[in-house]
Regions:
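Residues that mark the N-terminal boundary/hinge immediately upstream of a DNA-recognition element
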Residues: 5, 16, 42-45, 56, ...
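Short alpha-helical DNA-recognition segment
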Residues: 14-32, 36, 93-112
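DNA major-groove recognition helix of helix-turn-helix/homeodomain DNA-binding modules
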Residues: 25, 44-59, 123-138
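Short amphipathic recognition helices of helix-turn-helix/homeodomain-type DNA-binding modules
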Residues: 59-69, 138-139
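A short, Lys/Arg-rich alpha-helix, primarily the initiator
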Residues: 1-12, 68-91
Length: 139
C-alpha cells in the first residue's frame, strides 16, 4: 500500500506532521509511521484525512489518479460497508471462506465485517479494491 499522497497533500497544504497529528488527536510519531509505510492508517483516520483534504479515498490510496470527490463528506458506517462487501462478494460468486483465504484471515472475520459488527481493516479493504477493481469510496 502506498501512502505517498499523505505526504503530498500535507505538503500541498503547507502542514507539518505535528499539525495533522493534532487534527487527528494522535501522536506525531504515529502519523510519521503512516507516512513512511511502517504502519497502516486506520480507516477512520483515513476517512478524516480525505474529508479534511477534500479528496476521495481512491485518490488518497493511489487506486485512482483522478480526484473525483463530490465535495461531500464521507462517513464510516460499519453496517453499510458490511452490506456492500456482502453484495460485492455475492456478485462475484465468492464465498466468505474464499474471500477470507484471499485476505489471509478467517471466515469469522469476514462474517463480522459483513454483519457490521466490525469495521473492515484498511489493508483488507485496499486489497479487495485492488484485486477486484472496485472503488474504496463505494465500500
Amino acid at each position: 500500500m502506498n501512502f505517498q499522497k499523505l505526504i503530498e497533500l500535507r505538503e500541498d497544504f503547507n502542514l507539518k506532521q505535528k499539525d495533522i497529528a493534532k487534527l487527528l488527536n494522535i501522536t506525531q510519531q504515529t502519523y510519521s509511521l503512516w507516512e513512511n509505510g511502517s504502519k497502516i492508517i486506520p480507516l477512520k483516520h483515513l476517512n478524516s484525512l480525505c474529508n479534511y483534504y477534500n479528496v476521495s479515498m481512491d485518490y488518497m490510496l493511489g487506486l485512482s489518479n483522478k480526484n473525483s470527490f463530490n465535495n461531500g463528506k464521507y462517513n464510516i458506517d460499519k453496517k453499510i460497508i458490511g452490506r456492500r462487501l456482502k453484495e460485492f462478494r455475492k456478485e462475484k460468486n465468492i464465498t466468505q471462506e474464499e474471500l477470507a483465504s484471499t485476505l489471509n484471515t478467517t471466515h469469522s472475520t469476514i462474517s463480522a465485517y459483513e454483519s457490521g459488527k466490525t469495521t473492515i481493516l484498511t489493508a483488507f479493504a485496499y486489497e479487495i479494491c485492488k484485486r477486484y477493481n472496485i472503488s474504496m469510496d463505494y465500500l
